[in-house]
Amino acid sequence: LKGLYETDFLTLSEGQKQLCILARTIIEAAPLLLLDEPDSALDFSNRHLLMQHIRNIVSDGRCALMCIHSPELALEYCDNILLMKSGTILSTINTHTDSLDIINEKMSLIYDNINVIECTDINHKTHRVVVAL
């Protein structure tokens, strides 16, 4: 958004509009962020940049409650996941303490054809990755 300060909001792309709305929400410094698909309309880089920023805000003591539909993003950036279907909570996942077996069992309640595996990046950090079967 750098350099777009005087640009009319209505002329921005959908992704730029989403970033503006989220920036305004984050700057308000509310103790609780309620976010409905904050990653919608964002490209890959901005999606992960935004999620990392939300993660940093939470680590500073604020709370974020998000509705997201990507199991990959949920596993990477969320501490706790509520798995919902038709407005009913089917199960919860703690991404820090639940084993892969438990996560896969719980994810199968919503997603039939995925498997969560662990992999290590070049910096030797372990990530949980969703693989379609």
Q: At which residue positions do the language-model features occur?
A:
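H-loop (His-switch) and adjacent beta-strand-loop-beta switch element
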Residues: I81-N94
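H-loop/switch region of ABC-family ATPase nucleotide-binding domains
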Residues: I68-H69
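Catalytic Walker B motif of ABC-type/P-loop ATPase nucleotide-binding domains
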Residues: L33-D36
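ABC-family nucleotide-binding domains
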Residues: D43
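Helical segment within the ABC ATPase nucleotide-binding domain
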Residues: H48-D60
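Conserved ABC ATPase signature
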Residues: D8-L12
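ABC ATPase nucleotide-binding domains
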Residues: L100-L133
